[in-house]
Design a protein with these regions (language model features):
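Bacterial N-terminal signal peptides
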Residues: 1-9
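N-terminal, post-signal peptide beta-strand-biased segments of exported outer-membrane/organellar beta-barrel
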Residues: 12-118
Length: 422
């Protein structure tokens, strides 16, 4: 299992997993960090505490993991993206290994989880062309924009239930990764000088996440759980580097200028609150709200002469998720009655500004299933399948429509059970 975790982790690290021009700003497109069980509910989960699923978005949930078992969860996805700007359309495809996580019960009322998740993605390649002089139309220019890589986090977390109904937890993560972004300006006339700028950053820092869950029984068949999360603001200690290369069209000589900004990136305060209503262990309905306070942070920007940290490049990011799951009976003898049916919807505001205006807003809907995997001795493992549609758009800019298929495998193994010889 350890070897499998390592090989899958390397695959996760190798992914950028994105085709979107909007990933060229900030730290890229922030990941939803959904797992197999909540992808079908569009990421809702701050109030969920499942005994047979790994819910890393609120570490307090680890205290609910079954004793005597080891949970291993890995997810893959494939997506088709459609881009539309001024009637010009283009499609792109991606397939990725998204996450690898595990959890187990360490002591009474204490669970442990660890794994690797995406934090953000950078991936785009497009060009813009036009006439240098609209009147003469003799020469035209081409600006080419390219970017790749992304950021990931490897975490370990604890969840503990000190008193009945109340759980607390924490994740500590190593956050690492890099981005490379290039802008190249070239001309059809070989006598005009060309210009290219390369922007890069490499991060290796930490991230802390804290969580609380409180469950209250409100009737004979109904429970309500309140979930809260908090991640503190801190500087990632990483520099932002940029170099500019001017190519002389006459003799081919290069003029290179380099810039570097120390401690250029920060993570903001992040808070979340969620409610989950559980009716008779059949219906589970959740509502989450998260806020990421990016607005007061600065971003590295080239102003034409210098590479500097600038205010006004970020906005606070708000996200609302609503999701539900229905299962007639987890231990029913009928297979279809053990299947978990899920659906969800979410709305997200941008954390970046583009040319002084808000970046892309996101609206997403999803639906999916949790299918029990039946083997010779148990049916506690699950195959989680979901489909998601995402609309991403900003005023007067490109519109993106994304259809994504998520597949997660949750293996529930009896690692700690003592077997008796008959």
């Amino acid at each position: 299992m350890a070897a499998l975790m390592m090989s899958l982790a390397l695959a996760v690290n190798a992914q950028s997993g994105m085709n979107s021009p909007y990933s060229q700003w900030g730290l890229g497109l922030l990941s939803d960090q959904t797992s197999g069980f909540n992808a079908g509910m569009n990421g809702v989960g701050l109030g969920f505490h499942e005994h047979n699923q790994v819910n890393y978005i609120n570490p307090a949930s680890y205290s609910s993991v079954d004793s005597l078992t080891f949970l291993f969860d890995a997810g893959i996805s494939g997506q088709i993206s459609n881009f539309n700007e001024n009637g010009v359309k283009k499609n792109a495809k991606n397939a990725n290994l998204d996450y690898v996580v595990a959890a187990f019960r360490a002591f009474r009322h204490m669970g442990v989880s660890f794994g690797i998740l995406p934090f953000s993605n950078v991936g785009y390649n497009y060009s813009v062309s036009g006439w240098v002089n609209e009147e003469t139309k003799e020469d035209y220019y081409t600006n080419t924009y390219e970017g790749d890589e992304g950021f990931h986090q490897a975490y370990v977390g604890l969840g503990y239930m000190p008193v009945k109904g109340l759980s607390v937890g924490a994740n500590i993560s190593y956050l690492w990764g890099k981005y490379n972004r290039t802008v190249t300006n070239s001309y059809s006339n070989s006598y005009i000088n060309s210009l290219s700028r390369n922007y890069s950053a490499r991060v290796g820092s930490y991230k802390l996440d804290f969580g609380v869950q409180y469950t209250q029984r409100v009737s004979k068949k109904d429970w309500v759980t309140l979930g809260l999360t908090y991640s503190p603001k801190h500087n990632l200690g990483a520099s932002a580097d940029m170099y500019q290369v001017k190519t002389n069209a006459m003799d081919g000589s290069l003029d290179t200028t380099s810039f570097s900004i120390d401690k250029a990136f920060e993570l903001p305060h992040m808070v979340g609150a969620g409610l989950m209503w559980n009716h008779a262990a059949q219906w589970k309905v959740g509502l989450d709200y998260t806020l990421q306070m990016w607005e007061d942070l600065k971003a590295p920007v080239f102003d034409g002469r210098n590479y500097v940290l600038k205010d006004g490049c970020y906005s606070n990011r708000h996200k609302i998720n609503l999701g539900a799951q229905y299962c007639y009976g987890e231990y029913s003898r009928r297979f279809l009655q053990r299947v978990q049916y899920r659906a969800g919807v979410s709305y997200t505001t941008p954390y970046v500004k583009i040319n002084g205006q808000d970046g892309p807003k996101e609206f997403a809907v999803s639906a999916g299933f949790g299918i029990p995997i039946v083997n010779s001795y148990n049916s506690r493992s699950f195959l989680n399948i979901s489909g998601q549609w995402v609309k991403r758009s900003a005023k007067d800019l490109i519109k993106e429509n994304i259809f994504r298929i998520n597949i997660g495998f949750t293996f529930n193994e009896d690692w700690f059970k003592k077997w008796k010889m008959q």
